[in-house]
Amino acid sequence: MDSKESLTPGKEENPSSVLTQERGNVMDFCKILRGGATLKVSVSSTSLAAASQSDPKQQRLLVDFPKGSVSNVQQPDLSKAVSLSMGLYMGETETKVMGNDLGFPQQGQISLSSGETDLQLLEESIANLNRSTSVPENPKSSASSSVSAAPKEKEFPKTHSDVSSEQQNLKGQTGTNGGNVKLYTADQSTFDILQDLEFSSGSPGKERNQSPWRSDLLIDENCLLSPLAGEEDSFLLEGNSNEDCKPLILPDTKPKIKDNGDLVLSSSSNVTLPQVKTEKEDFIELCTPGVIKQEKLSTVYCQASFPGANIIGNKMSAISIHGVSTSGGQMYHYDMNTASLSQQQDQKPIFNVIPPIPVGSENWNRCQGSGDDNLTSLGTLNFPGRTVFSNGYSSPSMRPDVSSPPSSSSTATTGPPPKLCLVCSDEASGCHYGVLTCGSCKVFFKRAVEGQHNYLCAGRNDCIIDKIRRKNCPACRYRKCLQAGMNLEARKTKKKIKGIQQATTGVSQETSENPANKTIVPATLPQLTPTLVSLLEVIEPEVLYAGYDSTVPDSTWRIMTTLNMLGGRQVIAAVKWAKAIPGFRNLHLDDQMTLLQYSWMFLMAFALGWRSYRQASSNLLCFAPDLIINEQRMTLPCMYDQCKHMLYVSSELHRLQVSYEEYLCMKTLLLLSSVPKDGLKSQELFDEIRMTYIKELGKAIVKREGNSSQNWQRFYQLTKLLDSMHEVVENLLNYCFQTFLDKTMSIEFPEMLAEIITNQLPKYSNGNIKKLLFHQK
């Protein structure tokens, strides 16, 4: 008998296990199991007849296939082959196949031909018998189908002749059907070879007309998708749109979902089902497309996305995902579109590690939508209470359909640029005291002016004032406020202008009613821009106290020592004042020190004359509120000559009735009244600053006198007084140098004043001083 003729699958399967009279006897194993094989064995008719007649009631069959026990021919392990076709491996070499109540008494009664022992052909027949219909209830129709499945006479003439002779002997016997011997009854026509295996109560193997390979892909706790259920899960053979399940994924396509959630299945003619088995040497390997077995270490899922893979019907190239630990060494495949692969050669698939699924959300959420554009990618999970992103994007900001919120910079550029504070560069809140500043600098300036604080810089009076460091140095911040042009008079002026505008509005309303009246408009309006004079008013040092005890009897030594100590503090205040003058800090640092060393006595003498003029009507010398030199104290030794020069200044101020604005401009010009003969390092800038304050003095004169022809005459008188200050200061310095060098007088000098005198003495002795006079003698 040829080996090719050993196994031939029939078009329709016989539900009962029978031995046919054509080309041997046919025995059907496990008809309920899909993928089962039809085993044909050659049995002598006499033995079968004897077995049938001897015990007609016996219906159980025990077929034992030990190694080398069937006619000295190598017996293949049929149980192992059949079980491997189902994805189950039974490790026992000697497997017993249990059938219904019919048994063979001896092993030698059944013999297999050598051509029918080819295991590879058996595997091919198992693969071709994957799909079968349920067991029919009519045994006659089954028998007829079994007979029709037999080969034709012209194909097997020899076999037909042998069997036909045996059929004549079996005619008319009980338990036969058309010459075929019935091995089982109609209700016991199945042959369970998996009886020894333990299945759960819901296993499809315990049900009739079912197969474990018809079950849909399920989700369990230990793996992403599994063809078999766990110990506690049952197979779900049927599903509807209301169940949370994942539709079956075809190898080359993706499922279509209707609006109601039903799965649209393609016809079998267009889409072929995936092949369930692959041949690899001596065992059968199951490949489930689109499934990766996960390890049991942790419930972590791998999510892969390939953009452009939503087109159904296109041929997709498989990408092997290596590194997956499997027991059989299988290779699993993902599907991706070849067109998208060619467009994105440099891009790699995005794998996102998804955290473990909570206990209450272990099922897949249904895929909703219709059409090709609404297909859900494989591996997309929905978690309760979490935002679901598309597979192709790791964050919502990467998605082209999600627009990012407009940034603050883009909105800032669309509108007008913010106005900055001129002091600290913070965002300005408005115009305060004549300057565009923030609220913080506004409050600071008001408190600094009204509180008359004597701020001192711990550095070199060049601290950086910005939004962060504006509170570090109040002295530099106050100076910067003055340089920006802040003054308290601007607020008063603004109120005056507002009152004038309101008055003008009221008058205009009255004149509109009476056209005969003329509109009253003020001749001049005060300027809102702060002037240098207003800045000089702000930076003017406060009056210092000498701390002189008037209860103690006066003496020349005591008065001179107290005046020197007061002079030292006044010099410090003068340095601070000079650095706050607009434009002075632009000079070179050496020029600033030189000007202060040359003019410190000018500043002290002129300020003393101003205080005496304002408080004592030029009859007394008011050094401090608690130290006033009267006529009685002037009579002390070495006091009258010095007091006489100082009274001259106060008397001239009283005679000219100098205003406060004029005094401030004249005092600033005295700071710039003496320079070295060689000139300053920034001489041009110095000349420009000096000319600026000369003009300011002229403005102060015009402000006091108005549009009068006496302005130039007053300017001459004031500048003449400035020139006379050189002679007064020269006499005072000579006496100061004398008392400093004469140690017998024991007059104390503060450290600051002593340092200045020490540096100034050589310059005076060498004649390295140039006087800047307004008028030639």
Curated annotation (Swiss-Prot):
Zinc finger regions, NR C4-type: 421-441, 457-481
Residues annotated with Phosphothreonine modification: T8
N6-acetyllysine: residues bearing it: K480, K492, K494, K495
Cross-link (Glycyl lysine isopeptide (Lys-Gly) (interchain with G-Cter in ubiquitin)): K419
Localization (cell): Cytoplasm; Nucleus; Mitochondrion; Cytoplasm, Cytoskeleton, Spindle
Region (Modulating): 1-420
Polar residues composition-biased segments: 164-174
Cross-link (Glycyl lysine isopeptide (Lys-Gly) (interchain with G-Cter in SUMO2)): K258, K277, K293
Chain ranges of the NR LBD domain: 524-758
Record cross-link Glycyl lysine isopeptide (Lys-Gly) (interchain with G-Cter in SUMO), residues: K277, K293, K703
Any GO MF annotation of the entry: nuclear glucocorticoid receptor activity
Tissues in which the protein is found: Within the infant and adult hippocampal formation, highest expression observed in the DG granule cell layer with moderate levels in the DG hilus, the CA2-CA4 pyramidal cell layer and the proximal part of the CA1 pyramidal cell layer. Moderate to high expression levels found in the presubiculum and in its' superficial layers. Weak but specific expression detected throughout the entire corticle mantle. In the amygdala, moderate levels were detected in the lateral, central and medial nuclei. Moderate expression levels were present in the PVNh alongside the third ventricle.
InterPro entries named in the record: Glcrtcd_rcpt, NHR-like_dom_sf, Nucl_hrmn_rcpt_lig-bd, Nuclear_hormone_rcpt_NR3, Nuclear_hrmn_rcpt, Znf_hrmn_rcpt, Znf_NHR/GATA
Annotated region described as Hinge, given as residue ranges: 487-523
Annotated region described as Disordered, given as residue ranges: 1-21, 130-182, 394-415
Region Interaction with CRY1, residue ranges: 532-697
SUPFAM superfamilies: Glucocorticoid receptor-like (DNA-binding domain) (SSF57716), Nuclear receptor ligand-binding domain (SSF48508)
GO CC terms: centrosome; chromosome; cytoplasm; mitochondrion; nuclear speck; nucleus; spindle
Chain intervals for the UniProt region annotation (Interaction with CLOCK): 485-777
UniProt xrefs under Gene3D superfamilies: Erythroid Transcription Factor GATA-1, subunit A, Retinoid X Receptor
The record's note on its domains: Composed of three domains: a modulating N-terminal domain, a DNA-binding domain and a C-terminal ligand-binding domain. The ligand-binding domain is required for correct chromosome segregation during mitosis although ligand binding is not required.
Job description of the protein: Receptor for glucocorticoids (GC). Has a dual mode of action: as a transcription factor that binds to glucocorticoid response elements (GRE), both for nuclear and mitochondrial DNA, and as a modulator of other transcription factors. Affects inflammatory responses, cellular proliferation and differentiation in target tissues. Involved in chromatin remodeling. Plays a role in rapid mRNA degradation by binding to the 5' UTR of target mRNAs and interacting with PNRC2 in a ligand-dependent manner which recruits the RNA helicase UPF1 and the mRNA-decapping enzyme DCP1A, leading to RNA decay.
Assembly description: Heteromultimeric cytoplasmic complex with HSP90AA1, HSPA1A/HSPA1B, and FKBP5 or another immunophilin such as PPID, STIP1, or the immunophilin homolog PPP5C. Upon ligand binding FKBP5 dissociates from the complex and FKBP4 takes its place, thereby linking the complex to dynein and mediating transport to the nucleus, where the complex dissociates. Probably forms a complex composed of chaperones HSP90 and HSP70, co-chaperones CDC37, PPP5C, TSC1 and client protein TSC2, CDK4, AKT, RAF1 and NR3C1; this complex does not contain co-chaperones STIP1/HOP and PTGES3/p23. Directly interacts with UNC45A.
Protein name, UniProt field: Glucocorticoid receptor
Annotated source species: Callithrix jacchus (White-tufted-ear marmoset)
GN (gene name): NR3C1
